Amino acid sequence: IAHNICSSDGVRKGSIHSIEALSRTLLKLVNQTENSYSLNMGLFRVNLSDSHLTCTDGKGKIPIDGMITKNDYDLVRKTATAMSTPTNKLKLHTINKKFIINETFVVDDPIEMEAEVLESKVHIVTVSSASVRNIENCLKQSNLEVDDIVLNPIAKSNALLSQDDKDNGVCLID
């Protein structure tokens, strides 16, 4: 793993204030890192902090006739997230809370289970669409490609906690 440090030109108090300045900074940082470590960096995963983030819960329910398929799983999650999102917001993450089979059994993974009804409860994270577009514009102006944008606390938990830690309820305090 490589690392490098440079000034955060174009960013003030965690917000982008100049796309041009930040684009130059990103390009300089990538070039320094590639040269220092003999790397060719391609896709970038960006962790986002957003003071305008909101979290809501969603719930979806669909009828099932037999075994639950991946398509059923996708459809019930889509139904659970079918809330209207303001034009200035973007759904960044949908986090499964639980699946309920036949209004009785709570399961983590319903695929291939038999059911008449499948319900999904999810946690939906929305962020400022302008913040995301600004990040994408900075990277594009620097000829850098975005692979994914992840909310900062989720990125940290993915980097630091194992699946067992998460399953056992470990709390990461930032």
Predicted regions located by residue number:
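Nucleotide/phosphate-binding catalytic cleft detector across ATP-hydrolyzing
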Residues: 1-43, 48-173
